[in-house]
């Protein structure tokens, strides 16, 4: 299956066509750990462990089990080429990965087929998911800083959760430090990411994110920052949420 150079994908209120085009151009490089997606590959083990551990605490599973997510339905919104879908499928989850970029979905399907993983990939948006579908775990990882309406997007995510489910969101804080590190440093100095990958004014502070979630009857139960240590040349989970951060939310009791 060849990847097409352009594919507009579906249109919905939360989708920015410019953002789709931007990431569609990178579709063939998603699985290259040394390519333009290298930063995502480097933080991926931390994302996986954070989500896995949060899910195991919530659903009372043994995180050390190779099938710790067995029987749980997971929706990965903005899944790209499946960097999260594949490991969680291996842990037993029933994963649906959605992305508005047809080229990303094509890349995801090719890679999953090679690995013989039964992942349900769909070129669609969160607004187009059947409202009768419900998920134990909803992921919105590095997505909300690319949508046009954060509140509407999160509301739709919340509506797709099972009553006892969790939502995990990863994004970038909006302050001088995130501008210096995530844009100037990552895109212009270190060139870890293509220039224009992020727009600083679309970053979301933890307080803003929590306010949105509260509006949909949800509370934040866990949170963590992701920090790069240049001396050790590695990323780690941290209480420092000034730049990259993740939160776990669930319906308030």
Curated annotation (Swiss-Prot):
O-methyltransferase that catalyzes the 2 O-methylation steps in the ubiquinone biosynthetic pathway. Gene3D superfamilies: Vaccinia Virus protein VP39 (3.40.50.150). This is Ubiquinone biosynthesis O-methyltransferase. The lineage of its organism: Bacteria, Pseudomonadati, Pseudomonadota, Alphaproteobacteria, Hyphomicrobiales. PANTHER family: METHYLTRANSFERASE (PTHR43464), UBIQUINONE BIOSYNTHESIS O-METHYLTRANSFERASE, MITOCHONDRIAL (PTHR43464:SF19). The keyword Ubl conjugation does not apply. One of its GO terms (biological process) is methylation. GO terms for molecular function: 2-polyprenyl-6-hydroxyphenol methylase activity; 3-demethylubiquinol 3-O-methyltransferase activity; polyprenyldihydroxybenzoate methyltransferase activity. Transmembrane segments: none annotated. It catalyses: a 3-demethylubiquinol + S-adenosyl-L-methionine = a ubiquinol + S-adenosyl-L-homocysteine + H(+); a 3-(all-trans-polyprenyl)benzene-1,2-diol + S-adenosyl-L-methionine = a 2-methoxy-6-(all-trans-polyprenyl)phenol + S-adenosyl-L-homocysteine + H(+). Pfam families: Methyltransf_23 (PF13489).
């Amino acid at each position: 299956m060849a990847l097409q150079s352009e594919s507009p994908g579906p249109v919905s209120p939360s989708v920015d066509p410019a953002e789709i085009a931007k990431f569609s151009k990178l579709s063939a490089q998603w699985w290259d750990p040394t390519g333009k997606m290298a930063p995502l590959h480097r933080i991926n083990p931390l994302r996986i462990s954070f989500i896995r551990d949060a899910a195991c605490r919530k659903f009372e599973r043994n995180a050390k089990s190779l099938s710790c997510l067995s029987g749980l339905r997971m929706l990965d919104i903005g899944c790209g080429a499946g960097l999260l879908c594949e490991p969680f499928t291996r842990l037993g989850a029933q994963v649906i990965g959605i992305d508005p970029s047809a080229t990303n979905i094509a890349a995801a399907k090719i890679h999953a087929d090679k690995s013989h993983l039964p992942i349900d990939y769909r070129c669609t948006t969160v607004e187009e998911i059947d409202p009768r579908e419900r998920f134990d775990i909803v992921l919105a990882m590095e997505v909300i800083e690319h949508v046009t309406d954060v509140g509407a997007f999160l509301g739709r995510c919340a509506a797709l959760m099972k009553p006892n489910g969790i939502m995990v969101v990863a994004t970038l804080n909006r302050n001088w430090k995130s501008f210096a590190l995530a844009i100037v440093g990552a895109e212009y100095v270190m060139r870890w990411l293509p220039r224009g990958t992020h727009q600083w004014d679309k970053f979301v502070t933890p307080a803003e994110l929590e306010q949105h979630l509260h509006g949909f009857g949800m509370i934040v139960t866990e949170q963590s920052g992701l920090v790069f240590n240049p001396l050790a040349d590695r990323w780690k989970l941290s209480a420092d949420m000034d730049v990259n951060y993740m939160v776990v939310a669930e319906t308030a009791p």
